[in-house]
């Protein structure tokens, strides 16, 4: 089957859930037996999100091949279970950089470089390139921002041209917009959506499907009005009500007829979707048998999206154990003393310290790791959380004076965590240890029990590592190195032998978790937290 292209645009306001819609479309098509691939186009001028402030952008989702990408790629992977790559995330900055590099190399033979055709052609080449590289039946592209944004115009023009490149029968435009409900008059207002469609039409794009975000169900008269003013058949006007869980969204869209309409408009067989496992997962989420409290102690907790994949991985593990997860978002800066740690963490059945960069809030994380270690509370450290656990143990158990990380103190007396040799004297952007790396797991360890394997591969995003010069000082202690990278002998996993469940990893297991297939470490962490609550 020749690749078909679906483009998702947004209007009226941002943050309506284009990413979830794109992920849901991918899932509905895959559930019918078609192969899919999702990709995201962001109009910002940063080359990638790698150096962007988490408070502005949320988490950086890392692909298996080391791409630092938009968090929406996490939604795509979790919904479709299709591993994505660097080329599935494109920013305007990446597009312009490629064009300027080509121009400097004489690639345009001295010609004038312009937005049309050069920028639009570069965007089209990336869209079509995804189809060529993956061979997917459907290439689903989300266009960031809202229709009418100045920075998004080259992308809108590029997808307009794509329709004529691949043929109307192989291209579809899905437009997502808000239908506000005014309590005062008890009405859904369609005017903002009408103007959004009108704006899209002014750029030469006629949407094929309208997805309407609303708090209330659409009446027959509302559908008729939208159909009249948008040139879209009523059966292609899909309501998208606010769901209690994001994992209910594809089921709601399927019930609203989206899958059927997609197949009808593409003139392909509307196969029976296989959604039973997903439905069962959602039902389990809504009907837990127990509840536990997990304390997430981090640097960016004011914006939960900064830890989106961690939160979703915890939820998935909770679903596996039929357990509701109550997350305590704790700012590590607020933990300044042992008494603070006890006060903030007293209700936690398990503690997780996720990744981060810089020295802000580090003391609070050290006190958190110490509290978990000394009070036998299940602890899961990720990336920075692993480095914190090693430093805390060196300071308080091994009594290594002034143990620290050279990230926090370049002149640290005892840098238990240090910059990797090949990371010194390099620029910040694009220089981290990124993507999949192998790890050999020690026999009899908690990690081996979780993975049921002696060799794994996990995604990394870091510049600092455990300093192997200090390995001997940890020998014969309670902290063991249960996971090592075989190529460079780097410490990837640490555990405490006498602790019920204390595991910290240098990699990011959250990126590999799926709602109906939780990551083994998250699964066992939640089990340990459940047991901890029972045995208290």
Swiss-Prot record:
GO terms for biological process: 'de novo' CTP biosynthetic process; pyrimidine nucleobase biosynthetic process. The active site is at residues 383, 508, 510. ATP binds at residues 15-20, 72. Residues 1-268 are annotated as: Amidoligase domain. CTP binds at residues 14, 149-151, 189-194, 225. SUPFAM superfamilies: Class I glutamine amidotransferase-like, P-loop containing nucleoside triphosphate hydrolases. InterPro entries: Class_I_gatase-like, CTP_synthase, CTP_synthase_N, GATASE, GATase1_CTP_Synthase, P-loop_NTPase. UTP binds at residues 14, 189-194, 225. Its EC number is 6.3.4.2. Belongs to the CTP synthase family. CTPSs have evolved a hybrid strategy for distinguishing between UTP and CTP. The overlapping regions of the product feedback inhibitory and substrate sites recognize a common feature in both compounds, the triphosphate moiety. To differentiate isosteric substrate and product pyrimidine rings, an additional pocket far from the expected kinase/ligase catalytic site, specifically recognizes the cytosine and ribose portions of the product inhibitor. Homotetramer. Catalyzes the ATP-dependent amination of UTP to CTP with either L-glutamine or ammonia as the source of nitrogen. Regulates intracellular CTP levels through interactions with the four ribonucleotide triphosphates. This is CTP synthase. It comes from Treponema denticola (strain ATCC 35405 / DSM 14222 / CIP 103919 / JCM 8153 / KCTC 15104).
